[in-house]
Amino acid sequence: MAIIEVGRICVKLSGREAGSKCVIVDIIDNNFVLVTGPKSISGVKRRRVNISHLEPTDKTVEIGKGASDQEVEAKLKEQGLVDFMKEKVKVKIPVI
């Protein structure tokens, strides 16, 4: 089981969407993945994100690589994860 995999639900740690949950849709390379909220559920737009800015959760969604926002939204509703996705997480920024 890989931690960074298509369908893994993660929490964004930085940026304007910090604390919001998103789903990994595609793996671009060793450092970047394509994520979506989708925007209608968690407010996260479909975009490329550095994996160091994500915190993976233990939940996954069964989607195919490159799935559309509508497909992701349908799977989230099917698995009953919509309320989980809407919850915000308080992000703790480490002090250096």
Swiss-Prot record:
Superkingdom assignment: Archaea
A Gene Ontology molecular function term of the record: structural constituent of ribosome
Record flagged with keyword Nucleus: no
Pfam family, one: KOW
Any one GO cellular component localisation term in the record: cytosolic large ribosomal subunit
InterPro entries recorded: KOW, Rib_uL2_dom2, Ribosomal_eL14, Ribosomal_eL14_arc, Translation_prot_SH3-like_sf
CDD domains: eL14 (cd23702)
Record bears the keyword Ribosomal protein: yes
Alphabetic keyword roster: Ribonucleoprotein, Ribosomal protein
GO process annotations (BP): ribosomal large subunit biogenesis; translation
Family in the record: Belongs to the eukaryotic ribosomal protein eL14 family.
Designated name of the protein: Large ribosomal subunit protein eL14
Protein's organism: Metallosphaera sedula (strain ATCC 51363 / DSM 5348 / JCM 9185 / NBRC 15509 / TH2)
